[in-house]
């Protein structure tokens, strides 16, 4: 949500991020742009320019960032981009490809992977913006990149919040869960989460624009007067609705689940189902915890910068970039967490990366089944393969 490209000349820019000296220039989307959230209450960089910090009319730190710093940031962004795109697209492929992966929880995970993939796809643009000190991609891409950052932040936290409520229902109200926790309902809720995210994403898209200043182009958010009021209103809304409220809901849900799990030995009447329920609950909890750890620093940083003046130092510059990078890093961590914490994802990832003869045979059997529906005369052939297929399915069935 950082709204601007870093200007090439910072000599007369002394208050771009709500304090008396320019903050380090993240990239157009850095903080996931929350950098916008550390807004600029009085901006000497230009009389009509307003920024929320970070990308929003970014000013680079006094003096250009060192080559080592720039290379380090670009290397980190490159790793996050490659791992994030590959990992999240793999997660989406696995959920679409394998029928047994189409559970309510995995439908939510698909939505999370989609939001993360979109966010990591903006990193190449932000890297170029950071290195060149200008935004060379035009107004349309400026609007798209900034809005994607906001959409990612809100959709991700809304989805995690939904997953926590879903886990609460599964653990504490198992009977009601039978009717409520269906893939169809999960898809409807995912659509609702994107619609809710549009309450911020669409206005931001309309506010984003490019501005020419001192030989460079800024990708920035523009606000109506009084700019300080609308800047701070946006920062407060993001902090409350994308952090405080979801974290409170998640905390309450898991608090109630912990009490339930401690007080009841058997939740479903089956040890196997119980083990599966606890495993999925643990995975969702870890994903939520990692998200909070990755996003808390930038939220806190933005609020502090909005309230007090922070003198620019090397430590401040490094910590700022670290907070921004940490937010983006979360987008590539989730697929890794699924691979380590969920046996079903682990097995599907392994089958995708290292196809085995049994996997190929199972796929061929599936094709034969489909052909038989179209050509009933081949029923005898299918009968001979059914026994093999059943054995293969038993061997490769997702672990509970």
UniProtKB/Swiss-Prot annotation:
Post-translational modification Phosphotyrosine, affected residues: 168
Predominant place of localization: membrane
PROSITE patterns reported for this sequence: G_PROTEIN_RECEP_F1_1 (PS00237), G_PROTEIN_RECEP_F1_2 (PS50262)
Disulfide bond sites: 142-219
Transmembrane recorded as keyword: yes
Keyword terms of this UniProt record: Cell membrane, Cell projection, Cytoplasm, Disulfide bond, Endosome, G-protein coupled receptor, Glycoprotein, Lipoprotein, Membrane, Palmitate, Phosphoprotein, Receptor, Transducer, Transmembrane, Transmembrane helix, Ubl conjugation
CDD domains reported in the protein's UniProt record: 7tmA_Mu_opioid_R
Record topology, Extracellular segments: 1-68, 132-142, 208-230, 307-314
Cytoplasmic domain ranges by topology: 94-106, 166-185, 256-279, 339-400
Phosphoserine modified-residue sites: 365, 377
Motif (NPxxY): 334-338
UniProt modified residues of type Phosphothreonine: 372, 396
Membrane topology field: Multi-pass membrane protein
Tissue specificity field: Expressed in brain. Isoform 16 and isoform 17 are detected in brain.
Subcellular location: Cell membrane; Cell projection, Axon; Perikaryon; Cell projection, Dendrite
UniProt-reported outcome of changing residue 273 to A: Impairs interaction with calmodulin
KW Cytoplasm (keyword) present: yes
Residues linked to a glycan: 9, 12, 33, 40, 48
Pfam families: 7tm_1
InterPro entries per the UniProt record, alphabetical: GPCR_Rhodpsn, GPCR_Rhodpsn_7TM, Mu_opioid_rcpt, Opioid_rcpt
Other comments on record: OPRM1 is the main physiological target for most clinically important opioid analgesics. OPRM1-mediated inhibition of voltage-gated calcium channels on central presynaptic terminals of primary afferent nociceptors is thought to be one of the primary mechanisms mediating analgesia at the spinal level. Opioid-induced hyperalgesic responses are observed following both acute and chronic dosing associated with cellular excitation.
Complex and partners: Forms homooligomers and heterooligomers with other GPCRs, such as OPRD1, OPRK1, OPRL1, NPFFR2, ADRA2A, SSTR2, CNR1 and CCR5 (probably in dimeric forms). Interacts with heterotrimeric G proteins; interaction with a heterotrimeric complex containing GNAI1, GNB1 and GNG2 stabilizes the active conformation of the receptor and increases its affinity for endomorphin-2, the synthetic opioid peptide DAMGO and for morphinan agonists. Interacts with PPL; the interaction disrupts agonist-mediated G-protein activation. Interacts (via C-terminus) with DNAJB4 (via C-terminus).
Family: Belongs to the G-protein coupled receptor 1 family.
Entry function: Receptor for endogenous opioids such as beta-endorphin and endomorphin. Receptor for natural and synthetic opioids including morphine, heroin, DAMGO, fentanyl, etorphine, buprenorphin and methadone. Also activated by enkephalin peptides, such as Met-enkephalin or Met-enkephalin-Arg-Phe, with higher affinity for Met-enkephalin-Arg-Phe.
Protein name (Swiss-Prot/TrEMBL): Mu-type opioid receptor
Species the sequence originates in: Homo sapiens (Human)
